[in-house]
Design a protein with these regions (language model features):
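Metallocofactor- and cofactor-centric catalytic cores in central/energy metabolism, strongly enriched
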Residues: 1-244
């Protein structure tokens, strides 16, 4: 395996071998790369073909699935890969049976990116890891019924870029655009959260651990937390979480 997505990566250079510092196995890392390659293939298929109503959601879900510590279950990643490939076959149904394949909609082999020139690999990694984090924000906004088409469109552009043999001069503007669009995505999530749950005021947070059963939650999906609080109301179950 090779992964240097998080700040805990081994030796500040990358996790290799059978497992990463986070506990992710080589098999899981390989599936995440396969999923990313499938998402790039889907984005390439959409370059000259009309998307389906479901395509944006699948792109966002797929990218979110590859964020550190989100999904280390191999079966769920395989299901996501199948979902992405099925979506692509709906958009370009004739490609799989084409007698003279052009390769324009093929899934991308991530080894090409990991083995590229150091500077190119670094710039493409900034793009990839940036849109993965952005997808988390977009997903949380999406489940609350909010979306920004500019943000959604950029996911396709960024994924398409990863498969191109571009130099630093062409990649740097895309890296800068990741930051610009991510700011719009953060504004989208802020709007979704504040219009749904209200503007959060400063409060004192109790640190006492109460007696009785409890559930510990990590992450920042406020909608899931709301549902969990509703389902445990009056049952004597305490919910503990932390801010991200």
């Amino acid at each position: 395996m090779f992964c240097f997505q998080c700040e805990q990566t081994a030796g500040c250079s990358g996790c290799t071998g059978k497992a990463g510092v986070c506990g992710k196995t080589a098999d899981t890392a390989g599936l995440q790369d396969e999923l990313t390659g499938a998402l790039i293939g889907l984005a390439r298929a959409c370059a000259n073909n009309e998307r389906k109503e479901t395509t944006d959601r699948i792109i966002i879900e797929g990218l979110f699935t590859t964020v550190t510590n989100v999904a280390f279950d191999d079966d769920s990643i395989k299901e996501m890969i199948d979902k992405v490939n099925t979506e692509k076959s709906k958009i370009v149904p004739g490609c799989a049976a084409c007698a003279s394949r052009c390769g324009n909609t093929d899934n991308y082999d991530m080894k090409r990116m990991w083995e590229a020139d150091e500077d190119i690999r670094s710039l493409k990694s900034l793009i990839l890891f940036g849109i993965r984090g952005m997808a988390a924000y977009a997903y949380h906004a999406m489940v609350l019924g909010y979306k920004d088409q500019e943000v959604n469109n950029f996911f396709y552009k960024a994924l398409f870029t990863l498969a191109e043999d571009w130099g630093m001069e062409e990649l740097l503007p895309v890296v800068m655009e990741v930051g610009k669009v991510n700011l719009s995505c953060m504004a989208l999530l802020d709007k979704a959260n504040t219009e749904t749950f209200g503007t959060p005021p400063p409060v004192t947070v109790p640190l006492k651990v109460e007696k009785g059963p409890f559930i510990v939650v990590t992450g920042h999906d406020l909608y899931d937390l709301k549902l969990l609080l509703q389902q445990t109301e009056g049952k004597g179950i305490n919910i503990y979480t932390h801010g991200e």
